[in-house]
Amino acid sequence: MTEISEICETAFKLTYHPIYRGSLFIHLFVSISSIIPLIYFVIFKLPKTSFHGNLKFLFSAYFVSVFLFSVDFAIISTTEILIPLFSKHPCNLLIPDQYLKIGNTTVSIFMSLSTFFPISITIERFIAMKMARTYEKTRVRLGPILTGCNILLDLLIVFFIYRDEKFDDGSISFVFFPKTLAPKMFTFFWVMFFLNLINFTFNSYLLRQSIRLKVSTSSLATKYQREEVVHSTKFAVFVVFCHVILFGFYVIGIMILRYFGSIFIPDPADLMATRGAFTTMISLYNLVVGSVAVYLNHLIKTRKSEEITGTVRIQATGAVGAQNYENAIFNIWNSV
């Protein structure tokens, strides 16, 4: 009974701690705000891009996974805000085991799923660079296959991590990992972070190679195809970079607070509240990724339009303009 009372007392202190309580409202606001740019980009912007269907499919799946992550977090934060309003006893603040298992598992699935897609996008970009001359004519198969592999692999990993977990520690949040589960999940996140870091390096190499191949191409048709690969790869590189920075910040921050937090925050209650608040701030990643995608798409589209305008514009005045006019008339007569 003493242990149960201590758990309930700790739950009460953490639930009503101003740092943690305030973070839930911020978390809810950020989660809802992140949904808007994600929906806007996936529905209104991504379909209009000149990206190959495989890349569009992968980006759609990636941003949809981030969108589902935001929705899940919005539901979770709303629930955690409302629970104290209807709790009459400190122990009522603890989430029942069966609900905690479902909520915590979905958080892990959506959080980890988005970390697989940048690697798949790099695989698709590598194949696109190698097959630049014929890739535009290939059917949309690679994107769905890679997406299916991502989902299956993520589900299998989460299943093996969670299969022996009983969820009997008690928790006030769906986001907190149980003591026996936390080391496994953080190891998984570290592995994914380093894989994404390597992936970003390779993606940057692909971009440089694509630019080099475009410059060395003499054929106008081939140059245009290479240009499309360069633009889409640029977009992919910036999205992957954003993903690596934000995900890395989250993982490193969690580990610092977990193992060295007591050095900076000596009070146990304040440290626990700060760790809880930082854990919920992963929703900021969703907002930034969606907003950056919209901005980058607009920027690349604008620069591409300027490049095309500069390429096709011919001088229409003076001696050069007269020569251009004469050449145009000559070409028309030759085509008759």
From Swiss-Prot:
Superkingdom assignment: Eukaryota
Transmembrane segments: 24-44, 57-77, 109-129, 142-162, 186-206, 237-257, 276-296
InterPro entries cross-referenced by the UniProt entry: 7TM_GPCR_serpentine_rcpt_Srb
Pfam family membership, one: 7TM_GPCR_Srb
Subcellular location as annotated: Membrane
Residue stretches in coiled coil: none
GO molecular function, one term: transmembrane signaling receptor activity
Primary residence: membrane
Membrane-protein topology: Multi-pass membrane protein
A Gene Ontology cellular-component term: membrane
Any single GO BP term: sensory perception of chemical stimulus
Assigned keywords, A-Z: Membrane, Transmembrane, Transmembrane helix
Family as reported in the entry's similarity comment: Belongs to the nematode receptor-like protein srb family.
Protein known as: Serpentine receptor class beta-15
Species name: Caenorhabditis elegans
Lineage per the UniProt record: Eukaryota, Metazoa, Ecdysozoa, Nematoda, Chromadorea
